């Protein structure tokens, strides 16, 4: 669906196995749109990370640019 198309990840780690097992390790106020297993802590703002694993990585978000715009 659209959630998978819009999902993105800046930092994706994969195992060397075939097929690889990949996980997005981005930390943010929410998980990407296609995440099924999102874990957040209770800080303010929350720090969330997706624990889904896939055989691929999502495209990069370039979230660092967006974060700079929000901070200024």
UniProtKB/Swiss-Prot annotation:
The keyword Disulfide bond applies. Disulfide bonds join 8-61, 9-24, 12-57, 14-22, 31-38, 35-50, 40-48. Keywords: Disulfide bond, Protease inhibitor, Serine protease inhibitor. Pfam families: Bowman-Birk_leg. The record marks 16-17 as: Reactive bond for trypsin. One of its GO terms (molecular function) is serine-type endopeptidase inhibitor activity. The keyword Disulfide bond applies. GO terms for cellular component: extracellular region. CDD domains: BBI. PROSITE patterns: BOWMAN_BIRK (PS00281). The record marks 42-43 as: Reactive bond for chymotrypsin. Belongs to the Bowman-Birk serine protease inhibitor family. This inhibitor has two domains, each with separate antiprotease activity. 1 mole of inhibitor inhibits either 1 mole of trypsin or 2 moles of chymotrypsin, stoichiometrically. This is Bowman-Birk type proteinase inhibitor. It comes from Vicia sativa subsp. nigra (Common vetch).
């Amino acid at each position: 669906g659209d959630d998978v198309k819009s999902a993105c990840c800046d930092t994706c780690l994969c195992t060397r196995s075939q097929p690889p097992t990949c996980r997005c390790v981005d930390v943010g106020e929410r998980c990407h749109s296609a995440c099924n297993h999102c874990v957040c802590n209770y800080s303010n703002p929350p720090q969330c990370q997706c624990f889904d694993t896939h055989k691929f990585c999502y495209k990069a978000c370039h979230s660092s640019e967006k974060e700079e715009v929000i901070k200024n």
